[in-house]
Amino acid sequence: MVVWVGVYAILPPPTTPYILSEGLKNGSIRRTWVSVDDMAPVLLRSVVAAEDANFCLHWGFDMRQLRAAIADGGNRGASTLTQQTVKNVWLWHGRSWPRKALEATFTPIAELFWSKRRILEIYLNMAEFDTGVFGAEAAAQHHFGRRAADLTAIQAALLAAVLPNPKERQAVNPSSATQRRASAIADGAATIRRDGRSDCFE
Protein backbone atom coordinates (compact mmCIF):
# COMPACT_ATOMS: atom_id res chain seq x y z
CA MET A 1 0.00 0.00 0.00
CA VAL A 2 2.73 2.45 0.99
CA VAL A 3 4.73 1.56 -2.13
CA TRP A 4 1.66 2.13 -4.29
CA VAL A 5 1.10 5.59 -2.83
CA GLY A 6 4.80 6.35 -3.16
CA VAL A 7 4.85 5.41 -6.84
CA TYR A 8 1.90 7.71 -7.54
CA ALA A 9 3.77 10.55 -5.85
CA ILE A 10 5.92 10.53 -9.00
CA LEU A 11 4.01 8.76 -11.77
CA PRO A 12 0.43 9.39 -12.94
CA PRO A 13 -2.06 6.67 -12.03
CA PRO A 14 -2.77 4.92 -15.38
CA THR A 15 -6.49 4.46 -14.74
CA THR A 16 -9.00 3.73 -11.96
CA PRO A 17 -11.61 1.03 -11.31
CA TYR A 18 -14.40 3.51 -12.05
CA ILE A 19 -12.83 4.78 -15.29
CA LEU A 20 -12.39 1.18 -16.44
CA SER A 21 -16.02 0.35 -15.67
CA GLU A 22 -17.29 3.49 -17.44
CA GLY A 23 -15.15 2.68 -20.46
CA LEU A 24 -16.64 -0.79 -20.66
CA LYS A 25 -20.16 0.56 -20.22
CA ASN A 26 -19.90 3.48 -22.66
CA GLY A 27 -17.47 2.00 -25.17
CA SER A 28 -14.92 4.78 -24.72
CA ILE A 29 -13.84 7.59 -22.43
CA ARG A 30 -12.16 10.97 -22.92
CA ARG A 31 -9.17 11.65 -20.68
CA THR A 32 -5.83 13.41 -21.10
CA TRP A 33 -3.40 13.71 -18.21
CA VAL A 34 -1.87 17.15 -17.82
CA SER A 35 0.43 18.60 -15.20
CA VAL A 36 -1.12 20.83 -12.58
CA ASP A 37 1.12 23.54 -14.04
CA ASP A 38 -0.99 23.28 -17.20
CA MET A 39 -4.24 24.02 -15.37
CA ALA A 40 -5.56 27.50 -14.70
CA PRO A 41 -4.84 28.34 -11.03
CA VAL A 42 -8.43 29.54 -10.69
CA LEU A 43 -9.60 25.99 -11.47
CA LEU A 44 -7.68 24.65 -8.49
CA ARG A 45 -9.12 27.35 -6.25
CA SER A 46 -12.63 26.75 -7.59
CA VAL A 47 -12.54 23.01 -6.92
CA VAL A 48 -11.16 23.55 -3.43
CA ALA A 49 -13.80 26.20 -2.72
CA ALA A 50 -16.52 23.85 -3.96
CA GLU A 51 -15.40 20.60 -2.38
CA ASP A 52 -13.10 21.27 0.56
CA ALA A 53 -12.52 24.92 1.48
CA ASN A 54 -10.27 23.97 4.41
CA PHE A 55 -8.10 21.69 2.26
CA CYS A 56 -4.91 23.47 3.31
CA LEU A 57 -5.81 23.31 7.00
CA HIS A 58 -6.32 19.56 7.58
CA TRP A 59 -4.32 16.33 7.29
CA GLY A 60 -6.85 14.42 5.20
CA PHE A 61 -9.89 14.51 7.46
CA ASP A 62 -11.88 17.65 8.26
CA MET A 63 -13.04 16.86 11.78
CA ARG A 64 -15.34 19.87 12.00
CA GLN A 65 -17.19 18.84 8.84
CA LEU A 66 -17.24 15.24 10.03
CA ARG A 67 -18.84 16.21 13.33
CA ALA A 68 -21.39 18.36 11.47
CA ALA A 69 -22.23 15.45 9.17
CA ILE A 70 -22.73 13.13 12.14
CA ALA A 71 -24.93 15.71 13.87
CA ASP A 72 -26.97 15.96 10.66
CA GLY A 73 -27.59 12.22 10.69
CA GLY A 74 -25.18 11.49 7.85
CA ASN A 75 -27.27 13.40 5.31
CA ARG A 76 -24.45 15.74 4.30
CA GLY A 77 -21.08 14.95 2.79
CA ALA A 78 -17.89 15.35 4.81
CA SER A 79 -15.30 13.81 2.49
CA THR A 80 -12.20 15.91 1.92
CA LEU A 81 -10.49 16.20 -1.44
CA THR A 82 -7.83 13.79 -0.20
CA GLN A 83 -10.50 11.21 0.65
CA GLN A 84 -12.17 11.74 -2.71
CA THR A 85 -8.85 11.35 -4.51
CA VAL A 86 -8.11 8.10 -2.68
CA LYS A 87 -11.57 6.82 -3.54
CA ASN A 88 -11.24 7.82 -7.18
CA VAL A 89 -7.81 6.22 -7.63
CA TRP A 90 -8.17 2.94 -5.76
CA LEU A 91 -11.70 2.23 -4.61
CA TRP A 92 -15.17 1.62 -5.93
CA HIS A 93 -18.08 4.04 -5.87
CA GLY A 94 -20.99 3.57 -3.50
CA ARG A 95 -21.31 3.63 0.25
CA SER A 96 -20.19 0.69 2.35
CA TRP A 97 -18.24 0.21 5.55
CA PRO A 98 -15.43 -1.81 3.88
CA ARG A 99 -14.87 0.98 1.35
CA LYS A 100 -14.90 3.62 4.08
CA ALA A 101 -12.38 1.58 6.09
CA LEU A 102 -10.01 1.35 3.13
CA GLU A 103 -10.48 5.06 2.42
CA ALA A 104 -9.63 5.89 6.04
CA THR A 105 -6.48 3.76 5.77
CA PHE A 106 -5.23 5.21 2.49
CA THR A 107 -6.01 8.87 3.25
CA PRO A 108 -3.32 9.65 5.88
CA ILE A 109 -0.74 7.74 3.81
CA ALA A 110 -1.60 9.87 0.78
CA GLU A 111 -1.28 13.02 2.89
CA LEU A 112 2.13 11.82 4.09
CA PHE A 113 3.56 11.07 0.64
CA TRP A 114 1.78 13.57 -1.59
CA SER A 115 1.90 17.35 -1.43
CA LYS A 116 -1.40 19.20 -1.44
CA ARG A 117 -0.62 20.32 -4.98
CA ARG A 118 -0.03 16.69 -6.02
CA ILE A 119 -3.34 15.64 -4.46
CA LEU A 120 -5.13 18.27 -6.53
CA GLU A 121 -3.22 17.25 -9.65
CA ILE A 122 -4.32 13.63 -9.30
CA TYR A 123 -7.87 14.57 -8.35
CA LEU A 124 -8.28 16.93 -11.30
CA ASN A 125 -6.97 14.32 -13.73
CA MET A 126 -9.29 11.59 -12.43
CA ALA A 127 -12.55 13.39 -11.62
CA GLU A 128 -15.55 12.84 -13.90
CA PHE A 129 -16.98 16.04 -15.43
CA ASP A 130 -19.57 14.49 -17.78
CA THR A 131 -20.48 10.98 -18.87
CA GLY A 132 -17.21 9.43 -20.03
CA VAL A 133 -15.27 12.70 -19.65
CA PHE A 134 -12.51 12.49 -17.06
CA GLY A 135 -9.99 15.07 -15.97
CA ALA A 136 -9.75 18.82 -16.27
CA GLU A 137 -8.13 18.86 -19.71
CA ALA A 138 -10.75 16.64 -21.36
CA ALA A 139 -13.50 18.57 -19.53
CA ALA A 140 -12.21 21.96 -20.67
CA GLN A 141 -11.97 20.75 -24.28
CA HIS A 142 -15.36 19.00 -24.12
CA HIS A 143 -17.34 21.81 -22.51
CA PHE A 144 -15.56 24.97 -23.66
CA GLY A 145 -13.28 24.03 -26.56
CA ARG A 146 -10.16 25.24 -24.79
CA ARG A 147 -7.28 23.94 -22.70
CA ALA A 148 -7.52 23.64 -18.94
CA ALA A 149 -4.76 26.24 -18.75
CA ASP A 150 -6.97 28.79 -20.49
CA LEU A 151 -10.16 28.47 -18.44
CA THR A 152 -11.74 31.69 -17.22
CA ALA A 153 -12.92 32.13 -13.64
CA ILE A 154 -16.57 31.48 -14.51
CA GLN A 155 -15.69 28.44 -16.65
CA ALA A 156 -13.61 27.03 -13.80
CA ALA A 157 -16.49 27.63 -11.39
CA LEU A 158 -18.95 25.91 -13.74
CA LEU A 159 -16.72 22.84 -13.98
CA ALA A 160 -16.40 22.76 -10.19
CA ALA A 161 -20.17 23.13 -9.87
CA VAL A 162 -20.87 19.85 -11.65
CA LEU A 163 -18.89 17.96 -9.01
CA PRO A 164 -19.68 15.49 -7.56
CA ASN A 165 -22.76 14.82 -9.72
CA PRO A 166 -21.61 15.27 -13.34
CA LYS A 167 -24.26 13.02 -14.83
CA GLU A 168 -27.00 15.30 -13.53
CA ARG A 169 -25.39 18.76 -13.75
CA GLN A 170 -24.14 20.49 -16.89
CA ALA A 171 -21.34 23.03 -17.19
CA VAL A 172 -22.71 24.18 -20.56
CA ASN A 173 -26.33 25.36 -20.60
CA PRO A 174 -26.44 24.99 -16.81
CA SER A 175 -29.65 25.03 -14.84
CA SER A 176 -30.39 28.06 -12.69
CA ALA A 177 -29.36 26.03 -9.64
CA THR A 178 -26.01 25.16 -11.20
CA GLN A 179 -25.51 28.81 -12.19
CA ARG A 180 -26.14 29.89 -8.60
CA ARG A 181 -23.75 27.21 -7.38
CA ALA A 182 -21.07 28.37 -9.84
CA SER A 183 -21.50 31.98 -8.72
CA ALA A 184 -21.04 30.96 -5.09
CA ILE A 185 -17.98 28.90 -6.03
CA ALA A 186 -16.43 31.84 -7.90
CA ASP A 187 -16.90 33.98 -4.78
CA GLY A 188 -15.45 31.20 -2.63
CA ALA A 189 -12.42 30.82 -4.89
CA ALA A 190 -11.69 34.53 -4.51
CA THR A 191 -12.18 34.29 -0.75
CA ILE A 192 -9.75 31.41 -0.17
CA ARG A 193 -7.14 33.23 -2.24
CA ARG A 194 -7.65 36.39 -0.23
CA ASP A 195 -7.57 34.74 3.20
CA GLY A 196 -4.64 32.42 2.47
CA ARG A 197 -6.49 29.11 2.36
CA SER A 198 -5.08 28.43 -1.11
CA ASP A 199 -1.46 29.03 -0.14
CA CYS A 200 -0.57 25.34 0.17
CA PHE A 201 -1.18 24.63 -3.52
CA GLU A 202 -0.54 27.98 -5.22
Pin down the residues of each PLM region:
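Juxtamembrane regions of bacterial inner-membrane/periplasmic proteins
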Residues: 1-202
